[in-house]
Design a protein with these regions (language model features):
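Active-site-proximal or metal-binding-adjacent scaffold patches in catalytic folds
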Residues: 1-88, 97-133
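Walker B catalytic acidic pair
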Residues: 93
Length: 133
């Protein structure tokens, strides 16, 4: 089990992160002892998340909340009130953070994990050709 550190903006997603980490570990995958998760703003309009692997016991995952297209709509005031991370992006970056999938991009092991997540949890994490496409 890893120690999870979230910045203030990511705290609203803590239950999703904890569940996703547990789900991936239940499939037989491992994480580094320290997972740092925080948000970043505007380095790229295309990047939803990025995972950095360090030579110590640390893995850093950054999420760009602003680049996600899942909008929170407030029907009381009839306006978009915020943007949320998608669950599939959370699982996608956590898949890259596993010991088994890191440094291999969207290769064979990532594809295997994607298929397991899709089959078990019905979440398509994207990024690799799936047997279900």
């Amino acid at each position: 089990m890893s120690t999870l550190y979230l910045d203030d903006e990511m705290m609203g997603y803590k239950d999703i992160f904890l569940q996703a980490i547990q789900d991936i570990e239940d499939l037989g995958y491992r994480f580094k002892p320290i997972l740092l998760i925080h948000s970043y703003m505007g380095r790229s309009k295309k990047i939803l998340g990025v995972t950095y692997w360090y030579h110590d016991d640390t893995c850093l995952i950054e999420f760009s909340v602003d680049n996600h297209n899942i909008h929170v709509y407030d029907y009381g005031i009839h306006s978009i009130t915020g943007i949320q991370l998608s669950i599939s992006t959370i699982y996608h970056e956590l898949a890259h953070a596993t010991v088994e999938c890191h440094f291999k991009g969207h290769g064979k092991e990532f594809k295997k994990l994607r298929n397991k997540i899709l089959e078990t949890y019905k979440i398509d994490i994207g990024g690799a050709v799936s047997d279900y496409n």
